[in-house]
């Protein structure tokens, strides 16, 4: 759905692309979730709807038992941002983490201490710095961990953090930030942090997904009307649990569905 109304000052753009507030509306969130300011302040609604959507989705679950909602057991929240600010030398600004403990008597909705958000933040910052420094010739900076009053870390019913990954205003940060390999490394570090946090909370072992295969090729097979697939597994020097042991090849014919796979 598009809004071409000149009175709103909006361009020819999909509602879901106009920010979290309108994305939540068109995703079917209830009016109180996306319009707490009743249409008078889109900016504040856009900021708050992110947390309110989490609370509505998780409401009624064991992690948010007292709030009405859809009962989805969401265990944590991470808001990924980029930061402003620049340096006059060639140094990297780096990553900042934000959490909030001074709210609701220091408790989350399930009764957990809000310092769980600090633990979550620490995991993200540690993993990001380790993985980026190990992959790139860059002295990636771990900045502060702020215990401050931000909507995205105050309002969620579950442990939450804001990760200011890098400065979009600083040349040294963006020199890496535009590199697809950096984007993959940072994204994988975030994924590993989430996996480690959730498994630790449940006292479970975890296994990180292996890296994509290398040298993939397709050749005509020795038998008629057959193809031979070949590839090489890739070990992850940053994660010992990510060693590949086997692969599953799924097949589909035409527009049909994929089969159950062959190991």
Give the ranges of each region predicted by the language model.
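Single conserved hydrophobic/aromatic residue that forms the stacking wall/gate
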Residues: 1-14
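Second-shell loop/turn segments in exported
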Residues: 12, 36-44, 65, 105-115, ...
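Functional beta-strand-loop-alpha-helix junction segments that form "active/interaction loops"
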Residues: 12-66
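Loop/turn elements at helix/coil->beta-strand transitions in domains of secreted/extracellular proteins
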Residues: 26-32, 72-76, 157-161
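Active-site-adjacent mobile loop/cap segments within catalytic or ligand-binding domains
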Residues: 61, 77-107, 135-204
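Active-site-adjacent substrate-binding region
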Residues: 113-146
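Pro/Thr/Ser/Gly-rich low-complexity, intrinsically disordered linker/stalk tracts
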Residues: 197-241
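Recognizes extended acidic, P/S/T-rich segments that occur
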Residues: 242-263
């Amino acid at each position: 759905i598009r809004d071409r109304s000149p009175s709103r000052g909006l361009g020819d753009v999909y509602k879901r692309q106009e920010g979290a507030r309108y994305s939540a509306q068109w995703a079917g969130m209830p009016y109180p979730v996306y319009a707490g300011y009743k249409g008078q302040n889109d900016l504040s609604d856009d900021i708050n709807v992110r947390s309110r959507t989490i609370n509505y989705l998780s409401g009624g679950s064991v992690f948010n038992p007292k709030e009405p909602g859809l009962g989805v057991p969401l265990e944590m929240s991470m808001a990924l941002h980029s930061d402003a600010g620049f340096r006059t030398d060639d140094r990297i600004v780096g990553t900042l983490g934000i959490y909030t403990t001074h709210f609701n008597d220091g408790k989350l909705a399930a009764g957990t201490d809000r310092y769980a958000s600090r633990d979550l933040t620490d995991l993200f910052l540690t993993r990001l710095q380790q993985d980026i420094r190990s992959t790139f010739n860059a002295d990636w900076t771990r900045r502060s961990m702020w215990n401050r009053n931000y909507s995205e870390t105050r309002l969620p019913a579950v442990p939450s953090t804001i990760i200011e990954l890098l400065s979009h205003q600083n040349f040294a940060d963006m020199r890496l930030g535009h590199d697809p390999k950096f984007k993959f490394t940072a994204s994988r570090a975030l994924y590993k942090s989430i996996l480690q946090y959730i498994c630790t909370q449940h006292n479970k072992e975890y296994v990180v997904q292996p890296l994509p295969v290398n040298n993939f090729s397709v050749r005509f097979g020795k038998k008629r009307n057959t193809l031979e697939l070949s590839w090489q597994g890739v070990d992850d020097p940053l994660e010992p649990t990510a060693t590949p042991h086997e692969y599953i090849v799924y097949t589909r014919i035409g527009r049909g569905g994929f089969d159950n796979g062959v190991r």
